Amino acid sequence: SGNEKPLYYQENKDRFSKWNDKIVHYITEEIPNDFSHMLEKTKYHVAYNDVDPYGTKFIDLPIRFQRALYNRNNSSFGIEKAGATDDDLIITSDADEIINPYVLEDLSWFDPNNHYVALCNAYYYKLNFLYQDDWMGSRLCTWKHLKNTTVGQHRQDHANAYKIENAGWHFSFLGNAENFKLKLSSYEHTENNTAEVLSNVEEKVEN
């Protein structure tokens, strides 16, 4: 959306003190408002002159989607900073997606030449309101595979991803009506941030 967002981990590091030695926190300091300088391929990013899976050039997408794509793809620099090697299994997720740990207990199914998507139970509004049982959530592949594409392309490539059933959870629009409205005004899908949708927020949260 272009709105500034808090650095939640940075502000709450003390709550994660038990695991801080395992966490590499990479901050994208600035996201451009113009991507005309990125029409050609750059490290870990798409060529904005290329076409997305739906037939639109990245540079022709609404600026909010270009910015979201940049931010998502830039996370690969954090993976690099963590010291990933080609054979490492990389899981990329949005913050509200949790992969089922049982998926990772036995990796005999994992083929490093493929990439995978975790099909998740998606819960909206409340922890017990199941909205969808096949949400395409976390993506899994090797670092060798990921660094030769982008995080965003990897996430959009549904056709070639191997599906893992019952593989996690996706929680969205939880909390009270104010949290709901905050998300609507903060993420890239600002087409949902309309008077009509906002007027129904209280009803959706309560019912």
Set out the residue ranges of the language-model regions.
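Conserved catalytic core of nucleotide-sugar-dependent glycosyltransferases
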Residues: 64-65, 97-196
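Active-site-proximal specificity loops/subdomain of glycosyltransferases
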Residues: 2-92, 101
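Generic serine detector
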Residues: 1, 17, 36, 75-76, ...
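Residues that form generic nucleotide/phosphate-binding pockets
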Residues: 78, 183, 187, 204
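Charged phosphate-binding loop/patch that engages nucleotide di/tri-phosphates or the phosphate backbone
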Residues: 196-207
